[in-house]
């Protein structure tokens, strides 16, 4: 479950900015970029409580 954007035209060297609100108590959030669910070129997974440290984003 989440937001899916399609038909993005991203050229080599382009930047992608992501902006949003993270709910209080969230432990992580994920961005997958690729042509499809099984063809991912970039997986970014920010975790806020990795290894018990809540002051570091891993």
From Swiss-Prot:
Keywords: Extracellular matrix, Lectin, Secreted
Binding site for a beta-D-galactoside: 43-47, 51
Pfam families according to UniProt: Gal-bind_lectin
Molecular function in Gene Ontology: carbohydrate binding
Gene Ontology cellular component list: extracellular region
Domain Galectin, residue spans: 2-58
The keyword Nucleotide-binding belongs to this UniProt entry's keyword annotation: no
Entry's localization field: Secreted, Extracellular space, Extracellular matrix
Tissue: Detected in most tissues, most abundantly in skin.
Keyword Secreted included in the entry's annotation: yes
Function text: May regulate cell apoptosis and cell differentiation. Binds beta-galactoside and a wide array of complex carbohydrates.
Subunit structure comment from the entry: Monomer.
Name of the molecule in the record: Galectin-1
Species of provenance: Podarcis hispanicus
């Amino acid at each position: 479950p989440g937001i899916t954007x399609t038909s993005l035209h991203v050229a080599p060297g382009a930047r992608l900015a992501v902006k949003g609100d993270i709910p209080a108590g969230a432990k992580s959030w994920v961005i997958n970029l690729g042509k499809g669910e099984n063809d991912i070129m970039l997986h970014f997974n920010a975790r806020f409580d990795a290894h018990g440290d809540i002051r570091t984003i891993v």
